[in-house]
Amino acid sequence: MLTKIIAKASCKTNVPRPESEICDSMADVALKAIEKAKLTIDDIESIGIGVPGAVNPKTGVIEYSANLFFHNWQVVKMMEERLNTKICVENDANAAALGEYLAGSAKGAKNAIAITLGTGIGGGIIINGKIYSGSNYAGAELGHMVIVKDGKECACGRKGCWEAYASATGLINLTKQEILKENFDFSYMLKSCDGDINKVTGKTAFDAVLAGDANAKTVIDEY
């Protein structure tokens, strides 16, 4: 099996926005990557899409995605209309787990679990070489295990999910909370984002720790 990456392209998701606009962006990115690889869409037998949330790969529908703010998104149908080739969709962490199983750190294993960290926390489970999705296609949504009773609110609507604490989104929210504390005289964290709290990223607190910001250390210690 050929597993070499031969071209890359990317763009910002910029959610929330309409499904059609996101599909337009994904189609553009796919075509750019194909062009970089010196191929055409006619050379492509199929395209795979990895998406956070509960994904039904049989129907091609994203049933629910907390991070993309969509319900019952018919992504396969919409993308096939744009690219005129076979499209497959799977939960992003499931796809990552399968990739590790086929060609990565889990190659040669019978069973595997992968955990992805980014905007949220995802999980993928491989059993006997096959993706385990569970009865509701959310069997490996490890980020939505409740670790703190009545804890921080999560994007999924529950409270105390692991994702609310340990994802990049959780870190950004924690950084903002520390910046906004009362009697906060000076913060390298705030200075590094030009005084605009909306510019806080997952790197803000780490960069501030290296600059000697004690409040940033508090953020990292809690994270």
Label the predicted regions.
Residues 26-47, 86-87, 181, 185, ...:
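Phosphate/pyrophosphate-binding loops at sites that engage ATP/ADP/AMP, CoA/4′-phosphopantetheine
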Residues 99-100, 124-128, 132-134, 146-148:
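Short beta-strand-to-turn element immediately C-terminal to the catalytic PLP-Schiff-base lysine
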Residues 89-93, 147-184:
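Glycine-rich phosphate-binding loop plus the immediately following alpha-helix
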Residues 166-223:
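A mobile "lid/hinge" subdomain adjacent to the ATP/sugar-phosphate binding pocket shared
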Residues 5-42, 77, 211, 218:
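N-terminal phosphate-binding loop and adjacent alpha-helix
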Residues 13-27, 43-47, 53-111:
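Glycine-rich phosphate-binding loop and adjoining helix at the ATP-binding site
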